[in-house]
From Swiss-Prot:
GO cellular component: cytosol
Tree of life domain: Bacteria
InterPro entries: HAD-like_sf, HAD-SF_hydro_IIB, HAD_sf, SPP-like_dom
Organism: Staphylococcus aureus
Name of this protein: Uncharacterized hydrolase in edin-B 3'region
């Protein structure tokens, strides 16, 4: 039997921000299953997240997660870390691929200034940026008109593309600490993103798409989930449009992941 690959978005998918005592038993059950499948060499696991690597580590510590996914792709999958001999090591191979093209904060500032001036809107940095970043993320607060929001954001994506930069947008998730009625704006190198990370792992391990199961809950999961044959949107997702597009987990959060991973490795989704 060929090995299977399990892919998880992190915030509000693999990790519930408001994990309570009742949730902990479901979390432990999920981790126990993933540990068993990993030790039996049945699956490989990877987290694909927009969060920074340190943020992922801190959140795992909050709920005392013990299972270590083999790979963590942080910063909207622009950085890759692999569990090796008791610690996570950043992949130099992946880093070289990410930085194969110019990616400068000054260029991104110019792009945002252009759109800000054209539409009289503001883009707010989500954090303090350091030098040589691989992911720059901003908030855009809704104008109050969904169609107008999309018009502005699609213009941003087009203009960024004209400057040879990759920009993405998705609705912010207040459950993950984002503001209400806002959008996440993400700039990454072209060789980055959750879909790119998925295809990188497929090539690295020679895994066909039919042997992959993916989970997500928000707009930045849409591209990679759409690429997979076996993909689930978390039933706790707040994105109504995505709920119409993808199969929903039977249960939210840890329970949902546990059930569908079990069914997947048992071959119930094979055809």
């Amino acid at each position: 039997m060929s090995k299977r690959l399990l892919l998880f978005d992190f915030d509000e998918t693999y990790f519930k921000h408001n994990t309570n005592e009742e949730d902990l038993s479901h979390l432990r059950e999920m981790e126990k299953l993933l540990e068993k499948l990993t030790n039996n060499n049945e699956v490989m696991t990877a987290v694909l997240t927009g969060s920074t690597f340190q943020s992922v580590m801190d959140k795992m510590d909050q709920v005392n997660m013990t299972f270590k996914p083999l790979h963590i792709f942080s910063d909207l999958s622009s950085k890759m870390f692999t569990w090796n001999n008791g610690e996570y090591i950043e992949s130099e191979t992946y880093k070289k691929k990410v930085f194969s093209e110019p990616f400068l904060f000054e260029d991104i500032e110019d792009i945002l200034r252009h759109i800000s001036a054209q539409y009289n809107v503001e883009f707010i940095p989500q954090r303090a940026f350091e030098g040589n970043e691989t992911h720059y993320n901003f908030y855009f607060h809704s104008t109050g008109n969904h169609s107008n929001d999309r018009r502005i954001l699609e213009a941003l994506v087009r203009y960024a593309n004209d400057q040879n930069y990759t920009a993405r947008f998705s609705r912010s998730n207040p459950l993950a600490g984002d503001p209400e009625n806002a959008y996440d704006i993400d700039f990454t190198p072209s060789n980055a993103g959750k879909l790119y990370a998925t295809q990188f792992l497929m090539k690295k391990y020679n895994i066909p798409v039919k042997s992959i199961l993916g989970f997500g809950d928000s707009g930045n999961d849409e591209a990679y989930l759409s690429y997979l044959e076996h993909a689930y949107l978390m039933s706790n997702s707040r994105d109504e449009a995505l709920k119409q597009k993808f199969r929903l987990t039977k249960y939210p959060y840890y329970q949902g992941i546990t059930l569908h991973v079990k069914e997947f490795v048992e071959g119930k989704y094979d055809y």
